[in-house]
Amino acid sequence: MSSPSTFSRRSLLATGAGAVAATGLATPANAAAETPFRARKVNRPKRKPNLLVILGDDLGWADLSAYGSPDIKTPHLDRLAASGVRFTDAYSASSVCSPTRFGLYTGRYPGRLAGGLPEPIASPNKLHGIPLDHPTLASLLKEQGYSTALFGKWHCGFLPWYSPTRVGWDEFFGNFSGGIDYFSKFSHNGAYDLYEDEVEVEDLRYYTEIVTEKAVDFIERDHQDPWLLNLNFTTPHWPWEGPDDRDVSDELTARLKDGESGVLFHRDGGSLATYKTMVEDLDQSIGQVVRALERTGQLRDTVVFFASDNGGERFSNVWPFTGAKSGLNEGGIRVPTILSWPGTLPGRQVSDEPAVTTDWTATFLELAGATPAQDYPLDGTSLVPLLFGGRPRETQDLFWRMRGQRALRRGSLKYLQLDGTDHLYDLSEDVREQADLARKRPEDLAELRAAWERIDETLLAYS
């Protein structure tokens, strides 16, 4: 058995294989386990696919049974993984939520925009949001005839300056802030935060239930054109409330209204049991959405993507990695990621291709036949040639910065700077980032550090 400090790539590829083997879209329960991804040419339908882009919030890499969770059972996400490709080396664009969403919506490093600098956006500010003239995934797809919707967490700028419906989404239902109480819908700063487009609405049911209902209703419409649905759950972000925890919500909301600060960060509450309930409810909700695709005959016309917006928080499981949300160790940025397109993309595959949020933006644009705006070049690189064209991908530099931390991955090597100290790790042998090779391989360290600095020079400086 591998020791913790030398948990191998082979072990990662095997993680969760048995879990997904038990279920599958239109496959028998005893179907074969997943196999390593093999680049092959795949015939894609001429019709532009629908795009269902689902985000969990603060979900740890090993919080799904498809990724080896021993306690949390996620049969619907396991089934989704079994129907397509499960990625072991996929990353978020940041280790916190709003910068990752900037990366997803623009296909560019979060640091190219002022709104990507707060890490994350904590309060309304006219400087912090996606500029109204900046192209987005939604606006570029609208040019290709797509209808577009975003349900759930936005977190890319507050009213009165910013809104999804001003930058490409036809409709929006959700919250503008980084986190809200699941029942009362109050945000951590004491403001009520549930909107339809730009109009405040009242619905005191469990938030995950509401967002799921909206998604199902959208899918069940009589669509004449292809569509993009960004489905941004807040689960399992704080506060720690499951569907039956209205009493917890009442207590937290009362304290919030009394003026107590930091209430919704919920540092005096939560448990592993509550967290398990939240993740399993998220899984059941995604199952409802996928069943709506099946029921309406749209499943084979729809690319379904699932990931977390960053690494796990307090009660999450990021094994075998170290670190968590807000940090650039693997546990803060490596996220569970699934891509499914039944009938087009062969299923039961597991890939160790390194990819980051902005790469998925480029991928979705290419699948939709959209062209990035020349004045706003993408930083992401499409995976379409690899996934559907049978062409191996050139090694990419994956870049992060976060509150004085630095990270860059090239192949299996990772440059990491924490507290002003440079580190170098070989992730093919040391995913826990324990064996620092900085002194043994100074030339590699210098090369990756220089690559990081070249990218950083093109970004906005922190204020």
Predicted regions span which residues?
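Short Gly/Pro-enriched turn/cap motifs at secondary-structure boundaries
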Residues: A93, I130, K325-E330, L398-F399, ...
